[in-house]
């Protein structure tokens, strides 16, 4: 077993002499349990910024219409993230679940199952939808795109 640290980069490699992430494990990994950060998103000028350096699980209260999501800091390679969207007590907020851009304003294509059938975010007050997205190339997300799936809609 090789355990290495990279001086000046705060990286640890297990079975790797040149770690490429904060923790780089070169082999099968078994965890008894794990948890993820959950980050609350906010709407500013009808845009929502999803910073993937802060979390991969996000919550959003739709208190205004959302015309775009801006993805910041996608890691290199494959990653996924989930957004739980809850309509506020007013409801009827439109959410452009298919309108993703990078920090520079470049459109990120979103691919949906079923031949590209775009889901409609539940507009009913206090109802919740869950959407997950995956990219296989975070470093080129504007060309690789996101693959979106509906985790569920109209939760009470």
Q: Predicted segments — roles?
A:
Residues 8-36:
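Short sequence segments immediately N-terminal to proteolytic processing junctions that release a mature
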Residues 2-7:
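Extreme N-terminal basic, low-complexity initiation segments
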Residues 18, 41-49, 117-121:
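Intrinsically disordered, low-complexity boundary segments flanking structured domains
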């Amino acid at each position: 077993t090789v355990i290495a640290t990279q001086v000046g980069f705060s990286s640890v490699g297990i079975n790797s002499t040149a770690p490429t992430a904060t923790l780089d494990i070169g082999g099968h990994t078994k965890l008894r349990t794990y948890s993820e950060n959950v980050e609350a998103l906010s709407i500013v000028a009808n845009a929502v910024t999803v910073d993937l350096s802060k979390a991969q699980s996000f919550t959003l209260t739709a208190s205004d219409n959302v015309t775009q999501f801006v993805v910041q800091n996608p890691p290199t390679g494959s990653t996924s993230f989930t957004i739980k969207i809850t309509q506020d007590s007013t409801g009827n907020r439109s959410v452009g679940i298919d309108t993703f851009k990078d920090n520079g304003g470049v459109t990120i294509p979103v691919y949906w199952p079923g031949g590209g059938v775009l889901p409609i975010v539940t507009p009913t007050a206090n109802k919740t939808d869950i959407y997950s997205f995956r990219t296989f190339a975070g470093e080129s997300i504007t060309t690789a795109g996101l693959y979106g799936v509906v985790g569920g809609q109209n939760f009470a």
